[in-house]
């Protein structure tokens, strides 16, 4: 019979990790939101706005993975505890070994959930645009750009993401000069963002009749898709409303009734006022329209600032911003930021990028991160 105390301790440790995740991933709020979204999707009227319904469907899918994942692991760990007690009482080693095998699966699930903590950025769950630009070097560089495009397409396919080639400019002889790929899926931008930078290829060129070694560069830039559909929701609790007597033209209502309305939006300190209506109700309605317009403009300014920040990041990517070397004639691909190195080069170029991307995310890397020695 195997020793059971380490197995019990493992169940306890995994349970503690999941309970910690419940708080970090805001399980209770997500569960409540999942119930709301599910109820809304069950309404026959929701499909009157197909785009809105599709967005709700995507939100439900994302919420189900978190809420369902945590609940599933907790249920599994509870079952493991009961089975372990049964195995001990009956001295059944096969059952005990089955519990250990189940714990391996639960641990992998917990680690996957814990990895979601990497995606704390506001835009991490957005769709992503991947821009690929061949560097100087003619046909060799353009062929390298196409190889990278294929690599990302394969990687996205392996993750079940939806891809759309938005633009592609063919090379002079082979390959591509540039391409833009749109990627939609769970945390697409969060996963892809650390791929921004310059990718360096070293190989014996198939386009060189003398089979000489060539070095080529291609830049990759990843940006989030900014949702331009702005829904302004005003929480009544965020408003302070003052009423006062109108001044100026207004006939019999001037200085006789407090029909003028001033509304202060406390979070932004935006103040709007209206006194032209003939009733307080009318002035309040007009003031709320003015407030909604100002909040809309504020959101537009915020999103434009986000776009400007993304473009500023793009301009910072110089040809010295290398993030990964692909030295194919030595069967070596090395990430210059994390030190991760692989020798199965064809497998990587076929889209097996998880190890590189996960290491970058765990290191909290961003554009311009410090390189390790190549």
Swiss-Prot record:
The cellular location(s) given in this protein's UniProt record come to: Cytoplasm
Keyword list, A-Z: Cytoplasm, Methylation, Protein biosynthesis
Protein biosynthesis: present as a keyword of the record?
A: yes
Q: Which family does this protein fall into?
A: Belongs to the prokaryotic/mitochondrial release factor family.
Q: HAMAP family, alphabetically?
A: Rel_fac_2
Function, as annotated, reads: Peptide chain release factor 2 directs the termination of translation in response to the peptide chain termination codons UGA and UAA.
Q: What is this protein called?
A: Peptide chain release factor 2
User: Could you tell me which species this protein originates from?
Assistant: Stenotrophomonas maltophilia (strain R551-3)
Q: What is the lineage of its organism?
A: Bacteria, Pseudomonadati, Pseudomonadota, Gammaproteobacteria, Lysobacterales
């Amino acid at each position: 019979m195997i020793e059971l105390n380490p197995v019990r301790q493992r169940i306890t440790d995994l349970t503690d990790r999941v309970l910690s995740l419940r708080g970090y991933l805001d399980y209770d709020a997500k569960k409540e939101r999942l119930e709301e979204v599910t109820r809304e999707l069950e309404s026959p009227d929701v499909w009157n706005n197909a785009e809105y319904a599709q967005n709700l469907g995507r939100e439900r899918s994302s919420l189900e993975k978190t809420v369902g994942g945590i609940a599933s692991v907790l249920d599994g760990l509870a079952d493991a505890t009961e089975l372990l007690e049964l195995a001990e009482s009956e001295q059944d080693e096969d059952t005990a070994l089955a519990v250990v095998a189940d714990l391996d699966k639960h641990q992998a699930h917990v680690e996957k959930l814990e990895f979601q903590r990497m995606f704390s950025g506001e835009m991490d769950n957005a769709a992503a645009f991947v821009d690929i630009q061949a560097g100087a070097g003619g046909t060799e560089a353009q062929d390298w750009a196409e190889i990278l495009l294929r690599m990302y397409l394969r990687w996205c396919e392996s993750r079940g993401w939806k891809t759309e080639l938005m633009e592609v400019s063919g090379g002079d002889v082979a390959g591509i000069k540039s391409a833009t790929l749109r990627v939609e899926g769970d945390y697409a931008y969060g996963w892809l963002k650390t791929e921004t930078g310059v990718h360096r290829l070293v190989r014996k060129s198939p386009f060189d009749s003398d089979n000489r070694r060539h070095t080529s560069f291609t830049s990759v830039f990843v940006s989030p898709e900014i949702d331009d559909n702005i829904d302004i929701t005003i929480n009544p609790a965020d408003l302070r409303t003052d009423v006062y007597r109108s001044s100026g033209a207004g006939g019999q209502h001037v200085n006789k009734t407090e029909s003028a309305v001033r509304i202060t939006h406390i979070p932004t300190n935006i103040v709007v006022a209206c006194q032209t209506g003939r009733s307080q109700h009318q002035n309040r309605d007009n003031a709320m329209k003015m407030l909604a317009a100002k909040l809309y403009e504020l959101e537009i300014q915020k999103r434009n600032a986000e776009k400007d920040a993304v473009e500023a990041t793009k301009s910072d990517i110089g040809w010295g911003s290398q993030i990964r070397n692909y030295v194919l004639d030595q069967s070596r691909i090395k990430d210059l930021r994390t030190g991760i190195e692989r020798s199965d080069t064809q497998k990587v170029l076929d889209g097996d990028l998880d190890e590189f991307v996960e290491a970058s995310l765990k290191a909290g890397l961003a554009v311009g991160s410090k390189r390790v020695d190549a």
